Amino acid sequence: MRALFLLLFSLLPALVQAQPVMLSGNLSSAGSDTLGYLMTLWGDDFSRQSPGVNVQVQASGSSTAPTALTAGSVQIGAMSRPMQADERQAFEARYGYPPLAVPVAMDALVVVVNQRNPLQSVDPRQLDALFSVTRLCGAQQVPERWGDLGLHQPEWQQRAIQRYGRNSASGTWGFFKQQALCQGDFRNDVAEFPGSAAVVQAVAGDLRSIGYASFGFHLSGVKLLPVMTKNGEAVAPDPDSIRSGRYPWARPLYLYVNKAPGKPLPPLLAAFLQQVLSEAGQQRVSEAGYLPLSETQMAGARKALQ
């Protein structure tokens, strides 16, 4: 009996160590509308696994993430674009080191028209002429009717073009401005929406329209246009072309966090990011309509968290 007692006593530290750590507290994020649905899925999963954790998600646009992360009002800044230099500098001025960008999914900026529109592809210079007042990409003519884009069918040739897009708080807006407008200025008659879903729904209900949105919001009623590359190839946005980089407007989606060099993340934040980068977390990416990270990308993201 004494021997059994001693054996159990000797195993006690190991048994205590094996007990799972019970997480509790609040975890909050602000930023991208594109990532809003995914963040909600991940947050719900995390709260189910750790009932003592409350995850709050604000999705007002990528431009809100750097300010909130720098102020310390959130632990996660969700962004559909990289932080700009001035946003990083503001964070560094306060903390003395840059924020950590953790890629969590692959997305792409896509151009959408109504599913009944016969247009087969679009050239970036045409998009610049369509959406920009400055036309820095070099286009001369400003298309105002679908005949200007090569549609000569009687019901399309004289049909006016309606432009739909995102508002300036959006990372998708900033990415489109950079990639399609050569950093030019938008026309003031582009109808702006706070989310990609609203853009796609508007295009689905309007034969005249063309818009841009996130790949994750490819809903019924619209057609995703192939984009002409510099070598004259029309590349459609699909999982293969986005992963390979053939599609010109592929982009990672990021979660930015405050991680001091050489120091671990707080346990609650670290556990959440580990879940996001797990097989189950990446399955949620697929369910939401985006592309999971590759094994190489996953390994790099996990290493950055150490």
Predicted regions and their residues:
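Bacterial N-terminal signal peptides
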Residues: 3-14
